[in-house]
Amino acid sequence: MKDAAQQQEPVSARQTQVHRKSSKPESPPFIFDNPRIQPNTYCMVKLPSENFRVVKLIPNQTISIGKFGSFQVNDILGLPYGYTFEIQEDKRLRIIQEGVDDHDYVVGAKGALLEPEETNQTLIDTSESQTLSMAEIEEMKKQKTLSGKDIIDHVIKGHNEFHKKTAFSKEKYLRRKEQKYLRRFTPQPMCSSLLLDFYLEKDYKKVLDMSQEMLALLLSMANVRPGGKYLVVDETTGVLTAALMERMAGEGLIVVAHENEHPNLDALKYLSMPTELQDRMIKSINWLQFFEPEGEEEVPEKTPEQIASMKPRNRGAYFRKRNRWLELQNVNDLVANQGFDGLIVASTLHPASIVDRTLHAIGGSRPVVVYSEYKEVVTEVSQLMLKDLRVLAPSIWESRVRKYQTILGRMHPSMTSRGGGGYLVHGTRVFPNEEVNATQVRNRKRKREDGDKTKSSETEGKSEESVEPDTEQSAEPEAKLETDADA
């Protein structure tokens, strides 16, 4: 019997192991990073002037990038992101090898270390130092046989004071000319950080002046992870929601609360996310449906016979209403059962009121993060959290990144940079225990401290009394000695 039982144990273990394997999801997490350029997707094009341009890669079309030229979309499809292309004559492209094709028109300009005694003291850099006129330079730009590197070579040769410049000055001069004359571009995949930079340059009000470092700090403070359920108030044109989807890797739920008929998530179209993924992860609810769920009209389920008898147009409308009503019921269940893993607010509405009215839907030990471009707003939210026993340890955060120049052995911060970036207030959702009265514990502690003080004072008094008789006794022999001496 024991042998039979021992033989059956591995079988049951294998069955359990097979059952565990089958319970795992078959499809891997969704990955947003596509290493190759795909057609009919949006792409961020980095120009030599350090500016960005968002373009849609439609096959068999030509994309113009301003003064830097134009190129055919078919020439870059299927190639990896990150390559730098140079536009040649007849709109042909050539891949630039970084580190090999850079600055080879000036021998020794790059790689030469700057000596400590080298200065620009004898340099007189005026407009007369350049022998080429603007008309001649514009004529060279119109010639299709000359590349941007050839134009820079002619400009350097026509500069009478270039050889007097230090290596550091030469490097900065070359970079300025590259930004002006090189016909190059670098396609980069769309992501939330690049999309945020694009909106900051285009219209920073659309993203509430949020910087990259503050977006990263917000995601870290909110503990955004795959499989989480988050209540989000997003008025950054959908950039915040896109960042959450990237961090969650296609697993979890994002409930976007809004004040209009539909939420403004226009930025999601630039990331080329599948529509099925957006419908599965993102659910929207307006404030009226959030605060008064009983006012929503119920859409009852119909029998297959009733559905078959409906017209195709009415059948589609019924399924849309029914699915929408079921989504609202699921969201209301999360609100009632405190099923959200975090509250993230980035809105122009009154954040203190939003936190006060939505905090009941957040689970225990879950983060509450509020972003605002103004310090006064987050200070008001912090004061509200300090008075509210449902939030523990609120704190205000600020993060700034400063760019540095690293050229030929020198490193110093950039002299110009944009301000702003916003502020965060972070707290932890807790459930206070109303039965515990901390005042009694504090009074007992005070009584205990007072008792210790009285005991210590009594012991000090006794020690002083014990010392006084000794001093009197020690003084008596001295008096006797004095009387003997007088005698």
Curated annotation (Swiss-Prot):
The keyword Chloroplast does not apply. One of its GO terms (biological process) is tRNA methylation. It comes from the Eukaryota. Residues 1-34, 434-487 are annotated as: Disordered. Residues 466-475 have a biased composition (Acidic residues). Residues 448-465, 477-487 have a biased composition (Basic and acidic residues). Residues 1-16 have a biased composition (Polar residues). GO terms for cellular component: nucleus; tRNA (m1A) methyltransferase complex. GO terms for molecular function: RNA binding; tRNA (adenine(58)-N1)-methyltransferase activity. Keywords: Nucleus, RNA-binding, tRNA processing. Substrate-binding subunit of tRNA (adenine-N(1)-)-methyltransferase, which catalyzes the formation of N(1)-methyladenine at position 58 (m1A58) in initiator methionyl-tRNA. Belongs to the TRM6/GCD10 family. Heterotetramer; composed of two copies of TRM6 and two copies of TRM61. This is tRNA (adenine(58)-N(1))-methyltransferase non-catalytic subunit TRM6. The lineage of its organism: Eukaryota, Fungi, Dikarya, Ascomycota, Saccharomycotina.
